């Protein structure tokens, strides 16, 4: 174990814990012992809010790191929690943090697959380094019926189409790498997980979908039902900018990807964490607009393709509301607006 002067004490939520002095503060970080990413606090805050609302009986934090996620789930959501961590040094960090917080979480120095042989979980949290695809099948096999799986994906180069051959090799799809890429990327990941669940006669239903910084975060409910699996598959298809956005956009097919809702009604009634910060509250307001429209009206991009000056967000939303259109800021772009009308109507009202 490292010397004490190499530790840093951090407080997140209700938990005080230790992490390596050189822990990752921002960005995707590196795969190291005792890995802690401050940039994923929002991810954990939203997860805790969801779990306080859904109240599963037993949760698995499958890639423990410092143990911060599992410790917070146990204390703040009041759920029996198991943490698995294959890295021996990280496992020692988690044990130290359990003692520091006088917690009753269970910790195992085992692989993700091995821990699934010992328990049947109501909630499984998958936050690996990179893609979630190597782990999602095992999770869906070992989750209770109507249980939940939370996934954090950081392979955004593949999901956003910035490396087209990798996107096709990994997901069998084409994604346009432009201002709409993060909604496309989330829809691509949802579609892939829906298809994998359906192959097991299960329905994967997205509950909350988030893009932040270097990662996507999606929480699914998994329901054992071939009928519901078939219904979910009907929401997978291709999307054309020309017919889906406005005639000013060239015809260009993306997909196959998820064309259904990004959230369920649970996202509207989350039991928020105690003392939520401004970032959490602003993000939740944007998440709640996810399903006003499929994609969003990006006012800067529309101005670019029509060679006009960009309108302000405030004046654009005021015009839309004057026409009786419900609207809100999109989480996927700072110049994007989710609307209750067609995107074409929204663009033509604004411009």
What is each of the regions a protein language model found here?
Residues 1-351:
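SAM-dependent transferase fold signal centered on methyltransferase-like domains
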């Amino acid at each position: 174990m490292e010397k004490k002067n190499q530790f840093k004490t951090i407080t997140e939520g209700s938990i005080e814990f230790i992490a390596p002095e050189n822990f990752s503060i921002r960005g995707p970080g590196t795969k190291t012992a005792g890995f802690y990413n401050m940039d994923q606090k929002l991810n954990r805050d939203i997860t805790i809010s969801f779990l306080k609302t859904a109240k599963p009986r037993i949760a698995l934090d499958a890639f423990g790191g410092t143990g911060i996620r599992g410790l917070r789930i146990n204390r703040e959501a009041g759920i029996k929690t198991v943490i698995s961590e294959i890295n021996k040094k990280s496992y020692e960090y988690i044990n130290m943090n359990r003692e520091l917080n006088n917690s009753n979480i269970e910790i195992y120095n085992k692989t993700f697959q091995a821990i699934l042989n010992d328990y049947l979980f109501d909630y499984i949290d998958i936050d690996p380094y990179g893609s979630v695809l190597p782990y999602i099948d095992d999770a869906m096999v070992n989750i209770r019926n109507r249980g939940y799986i939370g996934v954090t994906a950081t392979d955004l180069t593949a999901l956003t189409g910035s490396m087209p051959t990798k996107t096709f090799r990994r997901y069998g799809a084409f994604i346009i790498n432009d201002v709409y890429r993060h909604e496309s990327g989330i829809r691509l990941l949802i579609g892939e997980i829906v298809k994998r669940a359906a192959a097991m006669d299960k329905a994967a239903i997205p509950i909350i979908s988030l893009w932040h910084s270097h990662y996507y975060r999606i929480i699914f409910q998994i329901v054992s039902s071939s009928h519901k699996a078939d219904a979910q598959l009907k929401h997978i298809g291709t999307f054309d900018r020309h017919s889906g956005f406005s005639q000013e956009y060239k015809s260009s097919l993306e997909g196959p990807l998820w064309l259904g809702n990004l959230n369920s009604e649970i996202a509207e009634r989350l039991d928020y964490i105690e003392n939520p910060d401004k970032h959490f509250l602003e993000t939740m307001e944007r998440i709640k607009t996810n399903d006003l429209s499929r994609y969003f009206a990006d006012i800067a991009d529309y101005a670019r393709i029509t060679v006009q000056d960009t309108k302000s967000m405030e004046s654009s939303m005021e015009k839309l509301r004057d026409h009786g259109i419900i609207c809100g800021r999109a989480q996927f772009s700072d110049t994007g607006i989710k609307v209750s009308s067609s995107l074409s109507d929204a663009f033509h009202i604004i411009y």
